[in-house]
């Protein structure tokens, strides 16, 4: 697959994801694909499908938005810098995400994603106990930084 074809496939994947089109979103993955992200490790199309169902259910308005360097591709590998934006239980969030895509043939074979769950927790913490817990963790991690 050429660099241009990989970028095109990633953009089509983003569009399907943003439309919450489960079957179309899943169609970009090889049968034995794997995806590692802060929510877990998902091996095979069935586990990836269950992950998408869960994401679409708890984050019905989550969108992938281009950010920063966007997509940098080389042969069968690409890195994508983007923002995940949505809401959870009525509270809005926006977090930076980085994904590494590796293709095999015309499908995604390996996907590794990272995003800051603590930043998301800070934006979504509800009530004094949750806010205190999240801020305590953040303050401990940033001790001596400022």
State where each predicted segment sits.
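Hydrophobic/aromatic beta-strand elements that line small-molecule binding cavities or substrate pockets
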Residues: 52, 66-71, 84, 96-102
């Amino acid at each position: 697959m050429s660099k241009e074809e990989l970028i095109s496939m990633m953009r089509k994947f983003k569009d399907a994801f943003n439309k919450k089109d489960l079957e179309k979103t899943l169609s970009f993955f090889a049968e034995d694909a794997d995806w590692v992200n802060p929510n877990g490790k998902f091996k095979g199309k069935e586990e990836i499908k269950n992950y998408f169902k869960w994401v679409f259910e708890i984050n019905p308005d989550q969108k992938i938005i281009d950010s920063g360097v966007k997509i940098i591709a080389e042969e069968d590998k690409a890195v994508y810098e983007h923002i995940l934006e949505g809401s959870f239980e009525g509270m809005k969030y926006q977090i930076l995400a980085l994904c590494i895509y590796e293709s095999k043939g015309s499908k995604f074979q390996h996907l590794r994603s990272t995003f800051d769950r603590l930043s998301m927790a800070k934006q979504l913490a509800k009530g004094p106990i949750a806010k205190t817990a999240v801020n305590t963790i953040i303050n401990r991690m940033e001790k001596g930084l400022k």
